[in-house]
Amino acid sequence: FYQRLKHMVNDKQHSRSIGPMVNLTRQPAEGRARDGGLRFGEMERDCMISHGASRFTKGRIYDASDTFSVHVCNKCGLIAAYNDVENIHLCKTCENRTDFSYVELPYSCKLMFQELLTMNIAPRLITE
């Protein structure tokens, strides 16, 4: 004997424009239950690149959810700390206070750099 299939379109459909973000990574939450974002995966990225839509790809992957700006020390290449009281940037490694470059990078990249620094691995950004 047969039973009715309970999968209905209204239970499956999901979309969103703006919604909750994960505090740690600053990226959209996962899943329909959490009103999460739709994943723009590797195959979708490769398809857009092959069609020559590089600005669209950068906008979806980087600008829409993950952009972050930092100041990088030109002497040692590490991300500089910012002092709110004195309104200055300071490199804690080489005590530099003047020679910095403004860099925009994904927040996930900055998070990975910080995790590597906790393991005593110093990734350096070379700016020219």
Q: Model segments located where?
A:
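Long insertion/accessory domains within large nucleic-acid-processing enzymes
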Residues: F1-E128
